Amino acid sequence: MLDILAIKADVYQLERQGKRLPVYRYLREVWQKEPPSEGLTVLALQQMVDYVEYVDDLTVLGEPWEAENEYDLYQDFLLDVISWGLQKYRAKKRFLWQICYYVNAWATFYYIFGREITKENVEQWKKTLFEEAKERYPDSMLFEFIPHAAQLDYGWFYRLTDEQWLQIRLEVGEWNLQKNDMDQAVQSYFDDAMTWYRDNGRKLLEAKNKTNN
């Protein structure tokens, strides 16, 4: 089986070139070599969502793409990845967390629509996937994390105990995140909540106490 750490190291080097298409071509190539692992599936999922969103923003800004069909390349690959992931890795924690993250914020990540997940059924997918996560990983804090972060529920973050924060760090640590952009985006997502969200929760509580006094 292809080594996901080696793949991420290759992606990291390609990202330093500042171009998207080389990363896409590399991921497409390794995707086709053998049945993709959960790690590769998650990486390709993240990367294509990020690229489709970025190219979409370029369109709004009127800036050029790297290729005339760049959006379609990423979108088609993204849908292939989602299909494979839902078929093979729906019960796996890392893939399940990532797809839950996207369906929870589907108004932003509508790029996932097209095959299994559509605008018409996304709310049902959201309900089903979070229920499956609760059933399969009842002790995990990571799936609870998603809706509270999306709602900027600072109070929830502030009320977490030190033991719960430690659990979150340990769970994220299981993913062995690397230096590539997508892994760093996930790390930043959790780090921000552990600092900025928690600090805002403290400030809101202090303000509330002052008002009550």
Residues covered by each model-derived region:
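Amphipathic alpha-helical repeat scaffolds of TPR domains
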Residues: 2-9, 33-64, 90-110, 138-159, ...
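Terminal, low-structured helical/coil segments at or just beyond the last alpha-helical repeat
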Residues: 163, 167-213
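Amphipathic alpha-helical repeat scaffolds
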Residues: 8-16, 24, 28, 83, ...
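Alpha-helical junction/boundary sensor with strong preference for TPR arrays
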Residues: 27, 33-34, 82-85, 89, ...
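A broadly used, surface-exposed interaction patch
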Residues: 58-91
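Surface-exposed cleft-lining segments at the edges of enzyme active sites
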Residues: 62-73, 106-118
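TPR/TPR-like (Sel1-like) alpha-helical repeat modules
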Residues: 118-141, 161-177
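Helix-turn-helix repeat elements of alpha-solenoid scaffolds
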Residues: 13-28, 67-80, 119-124, 163-168
